[in-house]
Amino acid sequence: LLARENFKRAGVDKLVTLIVGDAHEKVKMLKGPIDIVFIDADKDGYLDYLNKLLPLVRPGGLILAHNTTDVGSQMQDYLEAITTNPELETIFLHEQTTGIGVTLKKRLAK
């Protein structure tokens, strides 16, 4: 896989857990805490992934989602979820035409 090769070349292959397969099924098997999640899968499934992963992401953790600013996107429910949840803070990067959403799970106030 290209991702595995890139992680190795970057020297982080021992720090990254790469999960391959049906994401809707694989995500159910994950355990937290998770520091960073990168979602690049079926766009209709992003909200499902968020709902399953958010409880596992540690406070201060990041959720990166590919293609979040795609015009005519099928991800309106996901976008609404990450921009209206008070526990999250989201910015959008437009390095590519379809953008990447970067969502921070806020730390709990002490």
Residue ranges and their predicted role:
Residues 1-110:
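S-adenosylmethionine/decaboxylated-SAM
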